[in-house]
């Protein structure tokens, strides 16, 4: 158990401002066979990031962009140490646009060598938690990014090492994270890192990792899953039409108090001891009734405001987002050729 002094030492240096923003998906997939078979939206693959995304986020008052990336956008697992420079230049431009528009950029490995949260769908030739080769490749990539962006202040750029770790022990996860952080800090000692909690029935922080200097502890806002991923073909959720509050069984009703218990409380001790906490992903897929989604979002946003946690909606453009979400029950506004969910945007801007 990490002590309070260690946790205080591990908090993000200079306590970053409250970040509010979005996930941008251009590097989320590398080839059509990753997610596109389940949802055509995920067919957006290894494309350049889009400058107007940064401009619009800044115009609306947001200051954060998380880039969830598949390592296969820059490398082939058959030749993993050969890195495609063209892909890195795409990422360079996103980092530069972050500076231009005052938007913090967070690089994330959503698919790392040997691990994806969707392992059942996305087969890997290694296991990141047990295979040294996968761990060496993982550290090689993070060191490469650290060297490439050395000198860019952490106020502008952070590294979120692994998306939603699961199917591993806390000790296995800690070993991989510490190796990744060491590889980053060898090249760039001051780089801020973001560390996801372990995924299971609920998201739990690994308190020992909260003691890593200049780190942020990341959680999620996907609860209850039956509401946030209603009818999502990759999620296997019940077909019960969501309401908010939402009764899951005779004895369980999800409401604001349950959100606090399940999603805030596990991180409250760390936050009270000085750790910075951030919600790296959250949102509702487009089959959840719009009014229900907005009511649920308001409760989560108000809770995060109370504890001063920042957040990044999944996503800006797409089925969870404020642009081009393709909801059947929304009257969209034309925004430069895109369909804008103005009601959802204004709700986000309140907080």
Predicted regions and their residues:
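Mature N-terminal segment immediately following signal peptide/propeptide cleavage
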Residues: 17-26
């Amino acid at each position: 158990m990490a002590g309070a002094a260690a946790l205080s030492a591990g908090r993000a240096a200079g306590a970053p401002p409250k970040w509010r923003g979005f996930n941008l998906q251009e590097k989320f997939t590398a080839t059509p066979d990753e997610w596109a078979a389940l949802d055509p939206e995920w067919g957006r693959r290894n494309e350049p990031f889009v400058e107007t995304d940064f401009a619009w986020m800044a115009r609306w008052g947001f200051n954060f962009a998380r880039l969830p990336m598949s390592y296969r956008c820059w490398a082939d697992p058959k030749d993993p140490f050969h890195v495609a420079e063209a892909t890195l230049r795409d990422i360079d431009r996103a980092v530069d646009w972050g500076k231009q528009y005052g938007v913090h950029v967070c690089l994330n490995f959503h698919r790392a060598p040997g691990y994806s949260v969707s392992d059942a769908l996305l087969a890997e030739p290694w296991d990141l938690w047990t295979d040294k080769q996968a761990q060496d490749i993982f550290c090689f990539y993070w060191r490469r990014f650290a060297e490439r962006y050395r000198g860019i202040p952490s106020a502008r750029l952070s590294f979120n090492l692994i998306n939603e770790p699961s199917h591993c022990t806390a000790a296995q996860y800690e070993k991989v994270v510490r190796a990744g952080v060491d590889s980053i800090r060898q090249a760039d000692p001051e780089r801020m890192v973001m560390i996801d909690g372990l995924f299971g029935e609920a998201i739990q922080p690994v308190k020992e990792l909260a003691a890593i200097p200049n780190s942020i502890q990341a959680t999620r806002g996907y609860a209850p899953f039956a509401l946030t991923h209603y009818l999502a073909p990759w999620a296997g959720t019940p077909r019960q039409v969501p309401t908010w509050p939402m009764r899951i069984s005779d004895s369980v009703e999800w409401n604001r108090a349950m959100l606090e218990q399940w999603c805030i409380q596990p991180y409250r001790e760390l936050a009270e001891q000085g750790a910075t906490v951030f919600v790296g992903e959250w949102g509702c897929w487009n089959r959840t009734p719009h009014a229900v989604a907005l009511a649920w979002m308001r409760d989560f946003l108000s809770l995060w405001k109370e504890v001063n946690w920042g957040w990044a909606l999944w996503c800006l453009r797409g089925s969870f987002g404020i642009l081009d979400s393709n909801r059947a029950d929304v009257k969209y506004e034309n925004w430069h050729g895109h369909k804008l969910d103005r009601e959802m945007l204004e709700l986000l801007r309140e907080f």
